[in-house]
């Protein structure tokens, strides 16, 4: 009998949450439809309720092979509740990367979707001159998305960061082997792209031009001080 009361309380709490969720079903669908109409326009998508009743599957007419979900989340402690959540960014971004790689060779480089950034392009070079090739590949991806998946740009999902190894910045720690360089920023009026020349101008003065000397300075009587 001691355990009966906690069990009853848990059952009542679960029933309340469940009934509350079901009670919001119609309201949630209307909220999602308003959101979709505002983002993509009326009659540009199909929407189907999941069997769980808590989310809706949406397919844009322009992209019939891709289906994403939308759901309404409620948090009584949040000032922004209820809010709409979706896996749109992940589904469309990963698909765009997959399709781009089918027809564009990246060599030893890699391009991935990262939900905290959008896209990350990984490359290893020995000089800024070598950086031109991976930079052009990243620009090729932007051109590909602009042509095939412009909805990503419309939704502000084309931020690209280039993670560079092989060259190092002055004063960098021994374990600090990465240079992070933003090359594309999604803004309300389109994309802000950093040119290759701008990247070189920014990084050139900061790069190490010689390997670290663990023994410190070396002096030569005939030629003076060398590093």
Where are these regions (language model features)?
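Sec-dependent N-terminal signal peptides of Gram-positive bacterial secreted proteins and lipoproteins
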Residues: 1-24
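Terminal accessory regions that mediate trafficking to/through membranes and regulate activation
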Residues: 6, 20, 36, 57-59
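Short, non-transmembrane alpha-helical segments in secretory-pathway proteins
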Residues: 22-46, 93-101
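Exposed beta-strand-loop-beta-strand "reactive/processing" segments of non-cytosolic proteins
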Residues: 43-72
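Short, ordered beta-strand-loop transition motifs
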Residues: 48-53, 74, 110-117
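Generic recognition of long tandem-repeat/solenoid scaffolds
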Residues: 56-59, 79, 119-122
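A short, surface-exposed beta-strand/turn
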Residues: 66-89
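Extracytoplasmic electrostatic interaction patches
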Residues: 93-94, 102-227
